[in-house]
Design a protein with these regions (language model features):
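Donor-sugar nucleotide-binding helix/loop cap in glycosyltransferases
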Residues: 532, 546
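Alpha-helical solenoid repeat scaffolds of the TPR/TPR-like class and their adjacent stem/linker regions
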Residues: 1-446, 459, 501-503, 517-527, ...
């Protein structure tokens, strides 16, 4: 899950107005396909432009009017006609606006050409460099895009009296692209500079904080000029907050602040007073992760287990078509499968309403790819969230959260805006059908054959100072142990190595391996001796994989839903001895396994037998959800 890119980090494509004259330019023409114009007034403008007799201000006025009427292509033709036949000292302004129109139409090659002519004519027009960079980024030319934005930041390009916003925007784009490239140090520097210029950018603070997490820059919260501690806290994304604070109050406040500034709390009630009386309950799933995504990988058995005699199962899906057999299997699990990726939120909501869905389950919550605008219209009488975001969403249009009493005990419910819908056992589905695994040896991944291997393959941003200190404590007391981590990117790996060395961990006790295919990742789990869960953001789908590989997992359970996922699964399997409540217990449990080979073997047997018992009836969890849905409908009838 990745944090959502806020609108404050993006510069909208826009046109510019005429300003003081500069030297004339005569660029070569940039053309789009011809179009038949059946508008006498527009034809008059085209004729004047073709004769070089249309003033620039008249051109801009008419083109703005055409765009307001959604006649964008005709606007592009008028700009082209004027550019080809008119000499004007401010032709670069028309070129910029022409590029903007072409960019809106998705004609990236032509837009690039127009913008390049523009900046060649007026190198200090910051907006042109910004938009040219966006076009180049869209074409996959990231370094060239960065060069354009760097031009804006460079001294002498920006007009200080009017273009401070342009410099901030350029820095934000630079930070965004570097973040996407996992060049976190460069991204952090760009966004830091942006915040020094304007400290009130909550969306930029959000990204800056999460970048520091992903780069293991500790402390994550570092003081910035004119950014208060509270502003920094409340600007942190809910996803980042899950791994920063094991405090349900802070997580609720963070989610509420994020929803307020990103989506707002405006609701519609399309399904108001709707009480359907279908023979079978119509249960809908709204998701963009019905594929080989972490959430999707949990769902196949669960969805296939629905009782079709009592439930009619719908998908409203905007997942990527990855072409895998698993994706095909997920699609087959639904009685009605509606691809909605090309539809607007309103169109999806109206489709849900038209299908008279009784209960709609949003599989995203506040996770990456969420489309909360759909549920905000209340297209179904009852709506809830499941799996995508392990915490409260603070979205008033979601009535319930699917959970269990271990992961969300009643004492935590005051910190949720949703009511808990409790399932029996663990709320995490257990998909028994694993991918085909080709066994590997330790030598193939650079591990010592005789070492006690402790795998910790959670996302790097889930690592924090306290967790790293606990791992170091284990390594110091178990010299035969090796900590096996994921090599997410070169700089973060180097930083983790430096930190471990600084607290006295020998270099040979730490092994990093790069990301790999899902099949190889499962094979790696099978050559480890134990898995160390992260805290306070416990592993979710990874826990499922670990236990399916019969690998014991030590978890640290906390005070929030996300820090109790490991407890949820291990409790359901009867493996209570692997659940720690403090860092001290976490260390002690792991050391006991590391120093007692017989105990380790018994644990492996316990995990295997517990998983086999659980897998004998994969329909239990689905049946539990169905029972709760039936009770919910009856209660709200």
């Amino acid at each position: 899950m990745n944090a959502r890119t806020p609108s404050s980090m993006l510069l909208p494509v826009k046109t510019v107005k005429r300003k003081k004259e500069t030297s004339p330019v005569t660029p070569p023409p940039v053309a789009v396909a011809p179009v038949l114009i059946e508008d006498e007034d527009l034809n008059n403008y085209m004729q004047l432009a073709g004769m070089g007799k249309l003033r620039l201000d008249q051109l801009m006025y008419k083109c703005d009017a055409l765009q307001a009427e959604k006649r964008v292509i005709e606007s592009a033709h008028l700009y082209r006609q004027w550019i080809e036949h008119t000499e004007d000292p401010q032709k670069y302004l028309a070129l910029f606006n022409y590029g903007s129109v072409l960019q809106t139409l998705g004609m990236t090659d032509l837009a690039e050409e127009a913008y390049r002519l523009c900046v060649a004519s007026e190198p200090k027009l910051a907006q042109a460099h910004i938009n040219l960079g966006l076009v180049l980024e869209r074409k996959g030319q990231n370094q060239q895009a960065l060069d354009q934005w760097s031009n804006v930041v460079a001294q002498g390009v920006v007009n200080p009296s009017s273009d401070k916003l342009m410099e901030i925007t350029a820095l934000n784009h630079i930070g965004r692209v570097y973040e996407n490239q996992k060049q976190y140090e460069m991204a952090e520097q760009a966004l830091r500079r942006s915040l020094q210029m304007d400290p009130k950018q909550s969306g930029v603070i959000q990204h800056w904080v999460h970048i520091r997490q992903k780069a293991c820059m500790w402390p994550v919260y570092q003081s910035l000029p004119n950014v208060s501690a509270n502003d920094m806290l409340m600007s942190t994304s809910p996803l980042a907050m899950l791994s920063l604070h094991d405090d349900p109050v802070i997580q609720l406040l963070s989610a509420h602040a994020f929803v307020g500034r990103t989506y707002g709390f405006k609701e519609e009630f399309l399904s108001k007073d709707k009480h359907y009386k279908h023979k079978r309950i119509r249960l809908g799933y709204l998701s963009g992760d019905l594929c080989t995504h972490a959430v999707g990988l949990l769902m196949a058995d669960f969805l296939e287990a629905h009782d079709k005699s009592k439930f009619e199962i719908y998908a409203f899906d905007y997942s990527p078509e990855d072409g895998t057999p698993y994706r095909a299997r997920l699609k087959q699990a639904f009685e009605h499968f509606h691809p909605v990726g090309s539809l607007t939120d309103r169109e999806v909501a109206e489709l849900v309403l038209a299908n008279e869905i009784d209960v709609l389950i949003d599989m995203h919550g506040l996770s990456s790819g969420a489309r909360p605008g759909i549920c905000a219209m209340h297209p179904a009488p009852l709506q809830g969230t499941y799996l995508g975001f392990i915490g409260t969403t603070a979205m008033p249009w979601l009535d319930f959260v699917v959970a269990d009493r271990q992961v969300l005990p009643e004492e935590l419910t005051p910190y949720f805006t949703e009511k808990p819908l409790y399932l029996d056992g663990s709320f995490l589905p257990l998909n028994k059908n694993m991918a085909d695994i080709t066994p590997i040896t330790r030598a193939q991944v650079g591990l010592p054959e005789d070492a006690f291997v402790m795998a910790a393959f959670g996302n790097v941003y889930k690592i924090n100072e306290d967790l790293l200190a606990a791992w170091a404590n284990i390594l110091k007391q178990a010299p035969q142990a090796v900590l096996w981590l994921m090599d997410d990117n070169e700089k973060t790996t180097a930083e983790l190595k430096r930190k471990l060395n600084q607290i006295g961990v020998a270099a040979h006790q730490v092994q990093f391996s790069p990301r790999t295919s899902y099949q190889e990742y499962l094979a790696r789990l099978q050559v480890a001796d134990v898995f160390l869960d992260s805290y306070p953001y416990n592993c979710g789908s990874t826990t499922h994989d670990v236990l399916n590989c019969n690998l014991p997992m030590v978890t640290l359970s906390g005070k929030t839903m996300v820090s109790r996922m490991g407890r949820s699964m291990l409790s359901a399997l009867g493996l209570h001895e692997l659940i720690a409540n403090t860092f001290s217990e976490y260390v002690d449990i792991t050391l006991k396994i590391a120093n007692d080979a017989e105990y380790q073997k018994e644990l492996v047997k316990s995990v295997k037998s517990s998983m086999l018992r659980k897998q004998k009836n994969p329909k239990l969890l689905t049946a539990s959800l169905e029972k709760q849905v039936q009770l919910l409908i009856h209660k709200n009838a």
